[in-house]
Design a protein with these regions (language model features):
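Ordered alpha/beta subdomains of enzyme catalytic regions
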Residues: 1-169
């Protein structure tokens, strides 16, 4: 896939940068399985993080953000902010400044802590934590959270269902 990874999330997340308090320097996000629609399932198998980190965090960010000319990335982000969210030029410029600084940094300053893949996690218990390692980029973890959730939720559900089938096999 050849798309700016910041555009592979809930696009309104791009607006959060300007909504945080100016003095905020630390933000932690969690992935917590909330519940099951299947009777008798009160735990989920944590699975899919390694693939997400390799294909999305490392490969996609390098290929489609850090290794691209920033002007190209800026045009993509600017288009979403202007046409999709109705941002004014002033708001766009402020937001773009954050992305430009991250592009100049050339890596995602985040730390992801999680239970081991394959762990059976009770519903309502966080299985993953994302936090920034650089106060200037406190917002990056939250920007990743939506895509991470979308990317690993299906593998987690599939692994959980597979576990249930193994019980009866």
């Amino acid at each position: 896939m050849s798309m700016n990874p910041f555009l592979l999330t809930d696009f309104y997340k791009l607006t959060h940068i300007l909504q945080y308090r100016p003095e905020l320097r630390e933000l932690t996000s969690y992935l917590t399985p909330r519940g099951s629609r299947l009777k008798g399932i009160d735990k989920v198998v944590f699975f899919g993080l390694s693939a997400y980190v390799h294909s999305y965090v490392v490969k996609n960010f390098n290929d489609n953000f850090f290794n691209r000319n920033f002007e190209y990335c800026e045009c993509e982000i600017r288009e979403v902010l202007e046409l999709g969210l109705g941002y004014t030029d002033e708001m766009i410029d402020k937001t773009i400044g954050h992305f430009k600084a991250l592009h100049e940094l050339q890596y995602l300053p985040v730390e992801i802590n999680a239970v081991a893949e394959g762990t059976l996690v009770p519903m309502g218990v966080p299985c993953l934590e994302i936090k920034s390692t650089n106060p200037q980029f406190f917002w990056v973890g939250q920007a990743l959270e939506a895509s991470l959730s979308a990317a690993i939720w299906h593998p987690m559900v599939s692994a959980t269902i597979a576990r249930e089938y193994r019980k009866i096999a």
